[in-house]
């Protein structure tokens, strides 16, 4: 899961990847601890009978690739077996999408991961919405979402966490069908 370390970043949109890991790990009796050789917090869980490793890089977002590469090298995990969970400006809050491969789409964390791993890894994209102007993106991702947007983001994460055992047991297609069939969430009337 991608995010920025430290309490000052914990509630920001850019930490949606960390939010996912923070929901997934305890649900499967897992916890993360600092692992200096991976430059992050890591832990092992068992999901659908498979042992999986979770990682939250403790470098800033745009330097996450080294942590993930170190982790994969040590565990001998090929890129195509890696899932990177990250915030996605191009999806509205309340939407999560799974895909394999592709470019960075302007996401600096993904750019760094791609520079260390190539493009073949899987991505779970958690929609955070777009501020409307490219000039506002940096401040937007580093701010806490509105209460409505946070609820929608967390609902998308909840659905992805609930469907994750299906990904492990049955493959990506079924999880993709469930996530991608969900219509965009509607904002509550103000």
Question: Locations of the language-model features?
Answer:
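Short glycine-enriched, charge-decorated loop/helix-capping segments at active-site entrances
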Residues: 97-103, 141-145
């Amino acid at each position: 899961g991608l995010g920025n370390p430290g309490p000052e970043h914990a509630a920001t949109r850019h930490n949606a990847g960390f939010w996912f890991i923070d929901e997934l790990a305890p649900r499967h009796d897992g916890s993360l601890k600092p692992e200096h050789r991976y430059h992050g917090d890591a832990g092992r869980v068992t999901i659908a009978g498979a042992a999986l490793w979770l990682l939250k890089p403790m470098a800033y977002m745009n330097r996450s690739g080294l942590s993930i590469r170190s982790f994969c090298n040590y565990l001998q995990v090929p890129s195509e077996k890696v899932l990177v969970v990250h915030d996605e400006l191009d999806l509205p809050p309340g939407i999560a999408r799974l895909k394999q491969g592709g470019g960075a789409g302007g996401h600096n964390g993904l750019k760094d991961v791609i520079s260390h791993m190539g493009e073949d890894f899987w991505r779970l994209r958690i929609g955070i919405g777009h501020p409307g102007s490219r000039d506002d993106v940096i401040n937007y991702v580093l701010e806490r979402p509105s209460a409505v947007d946070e609820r929608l983001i967390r609902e998308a994460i909840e659905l992805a966490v609930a469907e994750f055992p299906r990904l492990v047991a049955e493959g990506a297609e079924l999880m993709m069908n469930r996530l991608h069939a969900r219509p965009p969430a509607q904002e509550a009337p103000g």
